[in-house]
């Protein structure tokens, strides 16, 4: 029973008879249950058209709506121009709990859509480990992938590997001079060498020519589709770094479907074709470099496409990658740091010049720790590995303090990191604070995980006592029960909104509110006590079971495990 759809359809039907056209209607949640469960302000919009007072319109519409006997609606009232709807909670709860019970962890899942999405995220340069800036990208991307798939899209994730350019040439030359520390995790060993070579070049600037020579030789080999000593050196360095990065991603519960190497577009000739096609537009200016004039798109800065000697730049290879990617999907989505805004706009403009569709881009602001900033060039950064290690260590300490089993510290630590990042809208800069991330009481993931564990504990106790759950709901429900039932019903809308707006924080914040609603229910509604009527016991147990299901599904969509005991 979809009560909201029933209400909206009934409103559309009566309003269309008044104004002979369909109108968009949005149901709002009321601030408290005394004012009903849902409200509409449509009468204020109709007042001008009908030349009537909104109060009178509301009263007239209520009379017509009452005559329709809307399924699931117990009462309808006109209040100062608003129309308030009161749910028949006994019917509503019974139907909803049965639906959740039947669908289990598929409750809220969208219908299969024949739409392919390629989602690119993380894509950190392979010159060191992921730091916490990359972590925000990775978590937003992975959570979004899970939500989009659950909503019914066919999703493929890409990691775009920047294996060309100066940074990788530095790593390759650094390995030649200093080697790699085999005792260290691979990406950290690469970072150490990267820092050493930067310091070395500051002291020996005359060696810079060797870096440029390496870059030229690598690109020449790629353009000729050759495999030689230079290409092997680059491939070794990149794969060595990626091995470490993949290990970190695995520890974060993140897996990419495809790793796309930037160099593949030089090797297959696509970069050359992109430059040729852009030349044909008449928008390319040749000075010291080849530059693309994008002033028609409101972008004053020119986009540098190639050096004077014709060698390609990151921008051209990025255009080639997008042309390829967008030809293989219906929707392309990129997750990028806010510092990439201008570059992303330039790539979009170039794609439009070439007659291509353009990607959707999710920009995120920077993340920092109170301790300070991050920099890979001189080796001052907080790696994701260190952050996760610290999270698990602190989670163990919290577990010991609370008498919780230590073996769930990984789930709590990883959940704390993933959730604390997912819950903040990407447009907002964030400071990662441990006291918030590992908060068992109010805002952290452990608070939500604890609500789930409490559900498991209640259900286990009921099983031991031989009490079965059943959606009876033949009694006057408390305000806490009503609030929790409404929250569970909202899950479907939350999935839709998160998927369609590409915003994972909507789901994250919903789960926190659901856990709070469950705790209020638990504190005020006895479940297994002897004095509780059998039908009430069964119904409340069913409510606990449904809450457990939705918390479990929601946390899984954020890539977070749910311990059964805490």
Swiss-Prot record:
It comes from Methanocaldococcus jannaschii (strain ATCC 43067 / DSM 2661 / JAL-1 / JCM 10045 / NBRC 100440) (Methanococcus jannaschii). It is an enzyme of class 6 (ligase). One of its GO terms (biological process) is arginyl-tRNA aminoacylation. It is found in: Cytoplasm. Its EC number is 6.1.1.19. Disulfide bonds: none annotated. Its main location: cytoplasm. It catalyses: tRNA(Arg) + L-arginine + ATP = L-arginyl-tRNA(Arg) + AMP + diphosphate. Keywords: Aminoacyl-tRNA synthetase, ATP-binding, Cytoplasm, Ligase, Nucleotide-binding, Protein biosynthesis. The keyword Ligase applies. A motif ('HIGH' region) lies at residues 124-134. GO terms for molecular function: arginine-tRNA ligase activity; ATP binding. The keyword Acyltransferase does not apply. GO terms for cellular component: cytoplasm. InterPro entries: aa-tRNA-synth_I_CS, Arg-tRNA-ligase, Arg-tRNA-synth_N, Arg-tRNA-synth_N_sf, ArgRS_core, DALR_anticod-bd, Rossmann-like_a/b/a_fold, tRNAsynth_Ia_anticodon-bd. Belongs to the class-I aminoacyl-tRNA synthetase family. This is Arginine--tRNA ligase.
